[in-house]
A protein has these predicted regions:
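Short coil-to-beta-strand
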Residues: 148-154, 178-181, 212
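Active-site cavity-forming subdomains of large catalytic enzyme subunits
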Residues: 1-169, 192-199, 245-264
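Contiguous, well-ordered alpha-helical segments that form the cores/surfaces of helical PPI scaffolds
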Residues: 12, 155, 184, 205-220
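Structural helix-adjacent loops and short alpha-helical linkers that scaffold large soluble proteins
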Residues: 164-173, 222-226
Length: 265
């Protein structure tokens, strides 16, 4: 569950994973995360206050981000000051941030995730707002009442592509190209427990390709994990995977056509 940090219930939300207190108000087995706008971090940096609202009083905030969010949020704060909005609470941004970090250290939850960067960098911004991520926070896709975001994931076994002290680029290209085609095929043959998931997956066709065995690859290369060389190798290896993945995706688009919501992305 993700909750924006302007929500009036955010302080209780932070306590959901605590090991003390009324167990009826705890969710020990649920993963939780904070969805934080840049404006909160700006207020925190300046030592300013932060206002919590009931979502029924500020319906637009959920679906906007960036400058538009900042403008609307400050408008709602002015309405709260003049009494037009009755249900709100003003807190010190640093106090809320301190509680966020305290709960994170104590329970591992809620995670800290950032709303504005996820939306600003989303290639699918033309079809809606990203409201959350997944369990491991590695995908950021649009969700709404008709669509439940689904992303088919795979990994390249990096140490299997180390040959004679370097990355075997041609072998890596072959593996990535095969993996991209495989993941795209999964979209069509997958089992979907609910129609909203199938609708989303086939409409946007999102896939994710990463790597595994990074430390093993470093070992084969004789590179220390805690070194500048390791950082450079991480950049180089992922740059290659990204390039070949995009190249393979373009080839698939030529062969099968673009996905339904490609235009405008």
């Amino acid at each position: 569950a993700y909750l924006e940090c302007w929500h009036l219930d955010v302080e209780e939300f932070l306590d959901l994973g605590k090991n003390t207190g009324d167990d009826r108000r705890r969710t020990h087995d649920m993963n939780t995360a904070n969805w934080i706008p840049d404006l909160f971090m700006k207020r925190l940096e300046k030592g300013e206050k932060w206002t919590l609202f009931s979502p029924s009083d500020v319906p637009e905030l959920h679906d906007i981000y960036g400058k538009e969010f900042e403008t609307k949020y400050t408008e709602y704060e002015k309405k709260a000051e003049t009494g037009e909005i009755k249900h709100f609470k003003t807190v010190e941004a640093k106090d809320l941030w301190r509680k966020i970090l305290s709960m994170l250290f104590e329970t591992g939850h809620p995670w800290v995730t950032f709303k504005d960067p996820c939306n600003i960098r989303s290639p699918q911004g033309h079809v809606g707002t990203v409201h959350s991520s997944n369990l491991c926070t590695e995908i950021t896709l649009n969700t709404n009442e008709d669509e439940i975001a689904v992303c088919n994931l795979g990994s390249i076994n990096l140490p299997q592509h180390i040959d004679e002290g370097k990355i075997n680029v041609e072998q890596l290209k072959s593996s990535v190209t095969t993996a991209i085609r495989m993941l795209d095929n999964v979209i069509d043959i997958n089992y979907y427990p609910v129609p909203q998931a199938e609708n989303s997956n086939k409409k946007h066709r999102p896939i994710g390709l990463g790597l595994m065995g990074f430390q093993d690859a470093l070992y084969k290369l004789g590179i220390s994990y805690d070194s500048e060389e390791a950082v450079e190798f991480a950049d180089k290896s992922m740059e290659l995977i990204s390039y070949f993945a995009i190249e393979a995706s373009c080839a698939l688009a030529e062969e099968r056509g673009t996905y339904e919501t490609y235009k405008g992305s």
